[in-house]
Amino acid sequence: MARAQWLRAAVLGANDGLVSVASLMIGIGAVNENNKAMLVSGLAGLVAGACSMAIGEFVSVYAQYDIEVTQIERDGDIDGADAAAAREKLPSPTQAAFASALAFAIGGLLPLLTSGFIKPWGPRVGVVCAASSVGLAGFGAAGGYLGGANMVRSGTRVLLGGWLAMLITYAVLRLFATIFHGMNISSSA
């Protein structure tokens, strides 16, 4: 049971990394056609997202750990050896943080590595979308499998959700670029 929960969390973390980094790269691509801008924004999103996921997971798991340790200590009918064994079974906040950061980074690497070094703007954005679509469908199907749900339905749901996130990010930043056209935000300087 615990293994399935870790695997499911890893799939969700990888999906989050993929959607976040791909959406960020596509959003930057909406306002700046420079390949370096997309690459740097994707890398920044990957690092920031992995750190954020790790810190959030560490805090969350540590809070749960503290609650469970306090409960173990309150239970007077557990002797010292049983209490120590119960503590050892609790999840490690450090391991959870590392796993969360790693999962996010793995997902975020997909759009970054498949498109970050393509110079022409159109093919670069197309590769981000295509690689991300394959990853989203795969992560969704894997999540469905691990959760005992229909893999096709789960893969489709994750794919559509990812497309929606990328579309909204592109549209909002494109609108921003149109409104603030005089600010010259798409220069490569």
From Swiss-Prot:
Segments crossing the lipid bilayer: 11-31, 39-59, 98-118, 125-145, 160-180
Primary site of residence: membrane
Q: How does it sit in the membrane?
A: Multi-pass membrane protein
Any one GO cellular component localisation term in the record: vacuolar membrane
Which of the residues are on side Cytoplasmic? 1-10, 60-97, 146-159
Q: Which InterPro entries match?
A: Ccc1_fam (IPR008217)
* Function in brief: Probable vacuolar iron transporter that may be involved in the regulation of iron distribution throughout the plant.
- Record protein name field: Vacuolar iron transporter homolog 2
| Native source species | Oryza sativa subsp. japonica (Rice)
Taxonomic lineage is: Eukaryota, Viridiplantae, Streptophyta, Embryophyta, Tracheophyta
